[in-house]
Regions:
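Phosphate-handling active-site elements
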Residues: 87, 97-99, 119-135, 213-224, ...
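Short helix-capping segments at alpha-helix termini
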Residues: 44, 126-130, 280-286
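Acidic/His- and Gly-rich active-site-bordering loop/insert found
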Residues: 2-101, 128-130, 350, 360
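Metal-dependent amide/peptide-bond hydrolase catalytic core
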Residues: 5, 12, 49, 183-392
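Acidic-glycine-rich active-site phosphate/pyrophosphate-binding loop
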Residues: 83-97, 174-185, 321-322
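Acidic/histidine-rich catalytic neighborhood of metal-dependent amide-processing enzymes
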Residues: 109-181, 391-392
Length: 392
């Protein structure tokens, strides 16, 4: 790394961010970590401001201005995390062990945010005035509603390209699937378990629906393929019904995670489930079910849209060039990954966007979430080179 910034800076910054809990069970969630990032950027000479998203929940927007002659680049990273749940170690200690930094959010994705900030300061402290601006959007809420990056786009911030720093293990993603969470509520009729014929068992009806979806819809999804993101997929994530063994279940819910391709849309996704429900209703007059879009996943106005690949965009070419030179081989193009805020930036912000960041996706949300310290150091260099090449 350039002498303008040391390796210790990015490691220490990552540790500081991990030590500040910012998940949904924390009061005001990301407010404390946002304040830390704001003060850190301001202290180190970046232009910085808050975006008030909801109550005390704020995005942090930091800028390293250029000469106004080159392309502008967004570094986007989310500052919320999933809760620690039952981790294998203290989730907010941010200790370093066997070459890894440990803790909730280190990999997904406070490490990347630290790398982005450090890269901006690296360029600033080297005295390199680039042609274009570098804009950090440290956003709230990606793990649920993505209200932070939705607010960024609605605020009018734009650029010629964007990097979303989700972990990519020295590869990159040009596209990913859209995301929709659906809840299907099945209605039955309660009765005593000794006389079940007087009731309508909602769990049995749910089982019938699941079998029909597996038989009719899932094979169709496997046939839908996209060069940059793999097949269309779905998952039954939760089923819950009934009250006790001695009663016929009068209700049952099924929650579905649906990952859809650019050739699909939310309306079509819902219709495919509704068509199966309607088919069962014609066979079984006692079958009652309705589909609900889950509130915990609904954005304000936007959908969790796909990241539509733009392989010929300047940002895609720059990321490819920098990664190839850094690892001295062809970088892997990831195709089967989770949803990211890149979908919002590309679909609604109309900004060509690429996903690449330190760490490995397999450690995100994991009981042993960790990130290689060397990845943090290396990605400061990678982000620095991407910015210098793209914004020159």
């Amino acid at each position: 790394m350039s002498e303008a910034f040391s390796a210790n800076d990015v490691v220490k910054l990552t540790q500081d961010l991990v030590k500040i809990p910012s998940h949904k069970f924390v009061e005001n969630r990301e407010s404390e970590v946002a304040e830390f990032i704001y003060n850190y950027c301001k202290k180190n000479g970046l232009e910085v401001e808050y975006q008030q998203v909801e109550g005390l929940r704020r995005n942090v927007i930091a800028k390293l201005k250029g000469k106004g002659t080159g392309k502008n680049l967004i570094f986007n990273g989310h500052i919320d995390t999933v809760p620690p749940y039952e981790m294998e170690f203290e989730p907010f200690s941010a200790e370093i062990k066997d070459g890894y930094l440990l803790g909730r959010g280190c990999n997904d994705m406070k490490g990347a945010v630290a790398c982005m900030i450090t890269a901006m300061l690296n360029i600033k402290n080297k005295g390199n005035l680039l042609g274009g601006d570098i804009i950090l959007t440290a956003a709230v809420g990606e793990e649920e509603k993505s209200d932070g990056t939705e607010f960024v786009v609605k605020s009018g911030i734009t650029a010629d390209g964007a990097i979303v720093g989700e972990p990519a293990n020295y590869g990159y993603a040009l596209g990913h699937r859209g995301l929709e969470w659906l809840e299907i509520r099945i209605e039955g009729k309660i009765a005593h378990g000794g006389i079940p014929e007087l009731g309508i068992n909602a769990i049995s009806k749910a089982a019938k629906l699941i079998r029909r979806i597996e038989e009719q819809l899932m094979p169709k999804l496997k046939e839908r393929q996209n060069e940059w993101m793999g097949p269309s997929v779905m998952n039954f994530g939760l089923i819950k019904g009934g009250t006790q063994p001695s009663s016929v279940a009068d209700s049952c819910i099924i929650q579905i995670d649906r990952r859809y391709l650019p050739v699909e849309n939310v309306e079509g996704v819902i219709k495919e489930y509704q068509d199966i429900i309607d088919e069962i209703k014609t066979e079984d007059p006692e079958f009652k079910a309705e589909i609900i879009r889950m509130d915990s996943n609904l954005m304000d106005e936007f959908d969790h849209a796909p990241l539509i690949a733009q392989p010929d965009s300047d940002i895609a070419k720059t990321v490819y060039k920098v990664l190839k030179e850094f690892i001295n081989k062809e970088p892997n193009i990831e195709k089967r990954r989770g949803w990211t805020d890149a979908g919002v930036l590309s679909t609604y912000g109309k900004i060509p966007t690429v996903v690449t960041g330190p760490g490995d996706l397999k450690y995100s949300h994991a009981k042993n979430e960790k990130i290689p310290v060397v990845d943090l150091v290396n990605y400061v260099e990678i982000y620095t080179k991407i910015a210098e090449e793209f914004c020159k």
